[in-house]
Amino acid sequence: MELTGFSRFHLKGDSAADWLASLVTGNLPRVGRIGLVYFASAKGKVLTEMSATRLAEDEFLLITGAGAYWHDRDLLNGYLPDTGDITLTDTTRDYATLLVTGPKSPAIIAAASGLSTAQADFPWLSHQSCQIAGCRVTAIRVSFAGEAGWEIHCDMADVVAVYDAVMAAGAPHQLGHFGMLALDSMRLEKGYRSWKSDLTSDYTMLESGLGRWVKFDKDDFVGRAALQAEHQAGSQRQFVTLTLDDPVDGNADPFGEAVYLSVVQCDGVDAGLVVSSGYGHRVNKSIAMAVIDKDKLASANQITVTVLGRPRAAHLVPTHVVYDPNNEKLRG
Protein backbone atom coordinates (compact mmCIF):
# COMPACT_ATOMS: atom_id res chain seq x y z
CA MET A 1 0.00 0.00 0.00
CA GLU A 2 1.28 3.46 -0.91
CA LEU A 3 1.04 5.97 1.96
CA THR A 4 2.97 8.93 0.60
CA GLY A 5 0.23 11.23 1.91
CA PHE A 6 1.69 11.03 5.41
CA SER A 7 2.68 14.38 6.91
CA ARG A 8 6.31 14.35 8.08
CA PHE A 9 8.37 16.63 10.27
CA HIS A 10 12.05 16.23 11.13
CA LEU A 11 12.87 17.49 14.62
CA LYS A 12 16.46 18.00 15.72
CA GLY A 13 18.45 19.99 18.26
CA ASP A 14 20.19 19.89 21.61
CA SER A 15 16.93 20.40 23.52
CA ALA A 16 14.58 18.75 21.01
CA ALA A 17 13.76 15.81 23.29
CA ASP A 18 13.01 18.03 26.29
CA TRP A 19 10.88 20.32 24.16
CA LEU A 20 8.86 17.46 22.68
CA ALA A 21 8.46 15.81 26.08
CA SER A 22 6.96 19.03 27.45
CA LEU A 23 4.23 18.93 24.81
CA VAL A 24 3.15 15.29 24.80
CA THR A 25 1.25 13.52 27.55
CA GLY A 26 3.34 10.34 27.63
CA ASN A 27 6.92 9.18 27.40
CA LEU A 28 9.15 9.42 24.33
CA PRO A 29 10.48 6.24 22.68
CA ARG A 30 14.08 5.20 23.16
CA VAL A 31 16.65 5.66 20.40
CA GLY A 32 15.98 3.09 17.69
CA ARG A 33 12.34 2.75 18.64
CA ILE A 34 9.01 4.22 17.52
CA GLY A 35 6.00 5.11 19.64
CA LEU A 36 2.73 7.01 19.60
CA VAL A 37 2.68 10.43 21.22
CA TYR A 38 -0.40 12.51 22.01
CA PHE A 39 -0.80 16.26 22.29
CA ALA A 40 -3.47 17.65 24.61
CA SER A 41 -4.87 21.13 25.11
CA ALA A 42 -4.55 22.98 28.40
CA LYS A 43 -7.97 21.52 29.26
CA GLY A 44 -6.76 17.99 28.58
CA LYS A 45 -8.67 17.64 25.30
CA VAL A 46 -7.17 15.53 22.51
CA LEU A 47 -5.46 17.68 19.89
CA THR A 48 -3.58 15.16 17.78
CA GLU A 49 -1.67 11.89 17.60
CA MET A 50 1.71 11.39 15.96
CA SER A 51 4.17 8.56 15.64
CA ALA A 52 7.62 9.54 16.89
CA THR A 53 10.58 7.66 15.44
CA ARG A 54 13.64 8.40 17.55
CA LEU A 55 16.68 8.58 15.31
CA ALA A 56 19.09 9.87 17.99
CA GLU A 57 18.92 11.32 21.49
CA ASP A 58 17.76 14.68 20.15
CA GLU A 59 16.50 13.76 16.67
CA PHE A 60 13.03 12.56 15.74
CA LEU A 61 10.89 11.82 12.71
CA LEU A 62 7.32 12.87 13.50
CA ILE A 63 4.68 11.32 11.24
CA THR A 64 1.02 12.22 11.22
CA GLY A 65 -1.98 11.79 8.95
CA ALA A 66 -2.40 13.47 5.59
CA GLY A 67 -5.53 15.28 6.74
CA ALA A 68 -3.75 16.61 9.82
CA TYR A 69 -0.98 18.37 7.89
CA TRP A 70 -1.99 22.00 8.40
CA HIS A 71 -3.27 21.43 11.92
CA ASP A 72 -0.17 19.62 13.12
CA ARG A 73 2.29 21.86 11.30
CA ASP A 74 0.76 24.91 12.94
CA LEU A 75 0.57 23.16 16.31
CA LEU A 76 4.28 22.30 16.29
CA ASN A 77 5.38 25.67 14.93
CA GLY A 78 3.22 27.47 17.49
CA TYR A 79 5.17 25.91 20.34
CA LEU A 80 8.59 26.15 18.68
CA PRO A 81 10.95 28.34 20.73
CA ASP A 82 12.98 31.09 19.08
CA THR A 83 16.19 30.08 20.84
CA GLY A 84 17.61 28.62 17.64
CA ASP A 85 18.72 25.33 19.19
CA ILE A 86 15.81 23.34 17.74
CA THR A 87 15.01 22.90 14.06
CA LEU A 88 11.68 21.62 12.76
CA THR A 89 11.78 20.79 9.06
CA ASP A 90 8.70 19.96 7.00
CA THR A 91 9.76 16.96 4.89
CA THR A 92 6.27 15.93 3.78
CA ARG A 93 6.98 16.40 0.07
CA ASP A 94 10.46 14.91 0.18
CA TYR A 95 9.64 11.32 1.06
CA ALA A 96 7.36 8.49 -0.01
CA THR A 97 6.05 5.60 2.09
CA LEU A 98 5.12 2.04 1.20
CA LEU A 99 3.35 -0.24 3.68
CA VAL A 100 4.12 -3.95 3.33
CA THR A 101 2.01 -5.97 5.75
CA GLY A 102 0.72 -9.48 6.26
CA PRO A 103 2.06 -12.84 7.45
CA LYS A 104 4.52 -13.05 4.54
CA SER A 105 5.89 -9.54 5.02
CA PRO A 106 8.95 -10.65 7.06
CA ALA A 107 10.09 -12.85 4.18
CA ILE A 108 9.38 -10.13 1.62
CA ILE A 109 11.24 -7.40 3.49
CA ALA A 110 14.16 -9.74 4.15
CA ALA A 111 14.42 -10.60 0.46
CA ALA A 112 14.15 -6.97 -0.66
CA SER A 113 16.53 -5.47 1.91
CA GLY A 114 18.87 -8.23 3.04
CA LEU A 115 17.93 -7.53 6.67
CA SER A 116 17.11 -10.20 9.20
CA THR A 117 13.45 -9.63 10.02
CA ALA A 118 13.29 -12.07 12.91
CA GLN A 119 11.65 -10.56 15.97
CA ALA A 120 14.94 -10.85 17.89
CA ASP A 121 16.85 -8.90 15.22
CA PHE A 122 14.18 -6.45 14.10
CA PRO A 123 11.58 -6.18 16.87
CA TRP A 124 8.13 -4.70 16.57
CA LEU A 125 8.12 -0.89 17.02
CA SER A 126 11.75 -0.46 15.97
CA HIS A 127 13.43 0.97 12.87
CA GLN A 128 16.55 0.32 10.81
CA SER A 129 18.23 1.93 7.83
CA CYS A 130 18.98 -0.27 4.84
CA GLN A 131 19.05 -0.33 1.06
CA ILE A 132 16.41 -1.58 -1.34
CA ALA A 133 17.22 -1.52 -5.07
CA GLY A 134 20.35 0.45 -4.20
CA CYS A 135 18.28 3.19 -2.57
CA ARG A 136 18.63 4.21 1.05
CA VAL A 137 15.42 3.61 3.00
CA THR A 138 14.23 3.66 6.59
CA ALA A 139 12.28 0.53 7.49
CA ILE A 140 9.94 0.89 10.46
CA ARG A 141 8.34 -2.23 11.88
CA VAL A 142 4.79 -1.06 12.45
CA SER A 143 1.45 -1.65 10.75
CA PHE A 144 -1.93 0.06 11.12
CA ALA A 145 -3.44 -3.15 9.73
CA GLY A 146 -2.61 -5.18 12.83
CA GLU A 147 -0.45 -7.71 11.01
CA ALA A 148 3.31 -8.13 10.81
CA GLY A 149 4.44 -5.26 8.64
CA TRP A 150 6.87 -2.52 7.75
CA GLU A 151 6.61 1.06 6.59
CA ILE A 152 9.31 1.71 3.99
CA HIS A 153 10.27 5.41 3.86
CA CYS A 154 12.41 6.56 0.95
CA ASP A 155 13.24 9.63 -1.10
CA MET A 156 10.41 10.58 -3.41
CA ALA A 157 12.72 10.16 -6.41
CA ASP A 158 13.42 6.54 -5.44
CA VAL A 159 9.91 5.29 -4.77
CA VAL A 160 9.34 3.64 -8.17
CA ALA A 161 12.58 1.65 -7.93
CA VAL A 162 11.85 0.66 -4.34
CA TYR A 163 8.28 -0.30 -5.22
CA ASP A 164 9.43 -2.47 -8.13
CA ALA A 165 11.98 -4.23 -5.93
CA VAL A 166 9.44 -4.91 -3.19
CA MET A 167 6.90 -6.25 -5.67
CA ALA A 168 9.56 -8.51 -7.20
CA ALA A 169 10.52 -9.81 -3.76
CA GLY A 170 6.85 -10.38 -3.00
CA ALA A 171 5.97 -12.17 -6.22
CA PRO A 172 6.71 -15.68 -4.82
CA HIS A 173 4.41 -14.83 -1.90
CA GLN A 174 1.51 -13.52 -4.01
CA LEU A 175 2.01 -9.95 -2.79
CA GLY A 176 -0.93 -7.78 -3.82
CA HIS A 177 -2.37 -4.32 -3.27
CA PHE A 178 -5.00 -3.10 -0.84
CA GLY A 179 -6.63 0.26 -0.18
CA MET A 180 -7.75 2.66 2.52
CA LEU A 181 -11.18 1.11 3.07
CA ALA A 182 -9.55 -2.24 3.81
CA LEU A 183 -7.04 -0.54 6.11
CA ASP A 184 -9.82 1.27 7.96
CA SER A 185 -11.64 -2.01 8.52
CA MET A 186 -8.51 -3.65 9.88
CA ARG A 187 -7.61 -0.78 12.23
CA LEU A 188 -11.11 -1.00 13.74
CA GLU A 189 -10.53 -4.68 14.48
CA LYS A 190 -7.36 -3.69 16.35
CA GLY A 191 -8.93 -0.79 18.22
CA TYR A 192 -6.62 1.75 16.57
CA ARG A 193 -7.88 5.33 16.58
CA SER A 194 -8.29 7.75 13.69
CA TRP A 195 -7.79 11.52 13.90
CA LYS A 196 -10.94 13.66 13.74
CA SER A 197 -13.22 10.70 14.30
CA ASP A 198 -12.08 8.89 17.45
CA LEU A 199 -9.46 11.53 18.28
CA THR A 200 -11.07 14.96 18.61
CA SER A 201 -11.02 17.93 20.94
CA ASP A 202 -14.61 17.08 21.92
CA TYR A 203 -13.17 14.65 24.46
CA THR A 204 -10.30 14.55 26.92
CA MET A 205 -7.44 12.08 26.77
CA LEU A 206 -9.00 10.07 29.59
CA GLU A 207 -12.51 10.12 28.11
CA SER A 208 -10.96 8.88 24.87
CA GLY A 209 -9.51 5.81 26.57
CA LEU A 210 -5.93 7.03 26.17
CA GLY A 211 -4.97 6.91 29.83
CA ARG A 212 -2.02 4.61 29.16
CA TRP A 213 -0.42 7.48 27.23
CA VAL A 214 -0.86 9.94 30.10
CA LYS A 215 2.12 9.77 32.47
CA PHE A 216 1.68 11.80 35.64
CA ASP A 217 5.12 10.74 36.89
CA LYS A 218 6.95 12.70 34.16
CA ASP A 219 7.85 16.38 34.14
CA ASP A 220 5.13 18.91 33.43
CA PHE A 221 3.35 18.80 30.08
CA VAL A 222 0.53 20.70 28.40
CA GLY A 223 -2.80 19.63 29.90
CA ARG A 224 -1.34 17.91 32.94
CA ALA A 225 -3.21 19.91 35.59
CA ALA A 226 -6.59 19.38 33.92
CA LEU A 227 -5.97 15.68 33.36
CA GLN A 228 -4.72 15.21 36.92
CA ALA A 229 -7.91 16.80 38.26
CA GLU A 230 -10.06 14.61 36.00
CA HIS A 231 -8.12 11.52 37.03
CA GLN A 232 -8.76 12.26 40.70
CA ALA A 233 -12.44 13.17 40.25
CA GLY A 234 -13.22 10.52 37.64
CA SER A 235 -14.23 10.97 34.01
CA GLN A 236 -17.89 11.49 33.14
CA ARG A 237 -17.61 9.72 29.80
CA GLN A 238 -15.96 6.52 28.64
CA PHE A 239 -14.56 5.34 25.32
CA VAL A 240 -15.85 1.88 24.37
CA THR A 241 -15.48 -0.62 21.56
CA LEU A 242 -18.63 -2.51 20.67
CA THR A 243 -19.50 -5.44 18.46
CA LEU A 244 -23.01 -5.41 17.02
CA ASP A 245 -25.31 -8.39 16.64
CA ASP A 246 -26.62 -9.22 13.21
CA PRO A 247 -30.06 -7.71 12.51
CA VAL A 248 -33.02 -9.80 13.61
CA ASP A 249 -35.66 -7.46 12.21
CA GLY A 250 -36.64 -8.74 8.78
CA ASN A 251 -36.81 -5.17 7.54
CA ALA A 252 -33.27 -4.30 8.60
CA ASP A 253 -30.51 -4.04 6.04
CA PRO A 254 -28.07 -6.85 6.89
CA PHE A 255 -25.22 -4.90 5.33
CA GLY A 256 -25.85 -1.67 7.20
CA GLU A 257 -23.20 -0.38 9.59
CA ALA A 258 -23.42 2.29 12.24
CA VAL A 259 -22.32 5.69 10.96
CA TYR A 260 -20.53 8.59 12.60
CA LEU A 261 -22.61 10.04 15.46
CA SER A 262 -25.07 7.13 15.52
CA VAL A 263 -26.85 7.07 18.88
CA VAL A 264 -25.82 4.57 21.54
CA GLN A 265 -28.48 3.71 24.13
CA CYS A 266 -28.19 2.04 27.52
CA ASP A 267 -31.47 0.37 28.50
CA GLY A 268 -33.33 2.47 25.94
CA VAL A 269 -31.92 5.82 27.11
CA ASP A 270 -29.57 7.90 24.94
CA ALA A 271 -26.09 7.52 26.43
CA GLY A 272 -23.53 8.44 23.78
CA LEU A 273 -22.44 8.62 20.17
CA VAL A 274 -20.51 6.45 17.73
CA VAL A 275 -17.22 7.98 16.61
CA SER A 276 -16.00 5.21 14.24
CA SER A 277 -17.58 2.12 12.77
CA GLY A 278 -17.33 -0.49 10.07
CA TYR A 279 -17.28 -4.19 9.33
CA GLY A 280 -14.35 -6.33 10.42
CA HIS A 281 -13.86 -8.85 7.65
CA ARG A 282 -11.24 -10.91 9.50
CA VAL A 283 -13.52 -11.37 12.51
CA ASN A 284 -16.86 -11.26 10.66
CA LYS A 285 -18.31 -8.70 13.04
CA SER A 286 -19.78 -5.23 12.84
CA ILE A 287 -17.67 -2.93 15.04
CA ALA A 288 -18.37 0.49 16.51
CA MET A 289 -16.25 2.78 18.67
CA ALA A 290 -18.20 5.19 20.84
CA VAL A 291 -17.97 7.61 23.74
CA ILE A 292 -20.81 7.16 26.25
CA ASP A 293 -21.94 8.32 29.68
CA LYS A 294 -19.96 6.39 32.28
CA ASP A 295 -22.74 6.15 34.88
CA LYS A 296 -25.32 4.95 32.36
CA LEU A 297 -22.88 2.33 31.10
CA ALA A 298 -22.13 1.08 34.62
CA SER A 299 -25.79 0.30 35.31
CA ALA A 300 -26.76 -0.86 31.81
CA ASN A 301 -28.31 -4.26 31.24
CA GLN A 302 -28.52 -3.75 27.48
CA ILE A 303 -26.61 -1.61 25.01
CA THR A 304 -27.96 -0.82 21.56
CA VAL A 305 -26.73 1.21 18.60
CA THR A 306 -29.13 2.80 16.15
CA VAL A 307 -28.41 1.58 12.61
CA LEU A 308 -30.64 2.65 9.74
CA GLY A 309 -33.21 3.82 12.27
CA ARG A 310 -33.36 0.50 14.10
CA PRO A 311 -31.63 -0.59 17.32
CA ARG A 312 -28.92 -3.23 17.05
CA ALA A 313 -27.82 -5.09 20.18
CA ALA A 314 -24.21 -4.29 21.07
CA HIS A 315 -21.61 -5.90 23.31
CA LEU A 316 -18.62 -4.37 25.07
CA VAL A 317 -15.12 -5.43 24.05
CA PRO A 318 -13.18 -4.83 27.29
CA THR A 319 -9.76 -4.84 25.62
CA HIS A 320 -10.95 -2.72 22.64
CA VAL A 321 -9.21 -5.30 20.43
CA VAL A 322 -11.36 -7.73 18.43
CA TYR A 323 -8.55 -9.20 16.31
CA ASP A 324 -5.34 -10.71 17.72
CA PRO A 325 -5.69 -9.14 21.20
CA ASN A 326 -2.25 -10.36 22.30
CA ASN A 327 -0.49 -8.83 19.25
CA GLU A 328 1.04 -12.17 18.32
CA LYS A 329 0.68 -11.48 14.60
CA LEU A 330 2.36 -8.08 14.87
CA ARG A 331 5.41 -9.80 16.31
CA GLY A 332 5.23 -12.73 13.90
What name fits each language-model region?
Residues 1-332:
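Basic, glycine/lysine-rich polyanion-binding surfaces/domains
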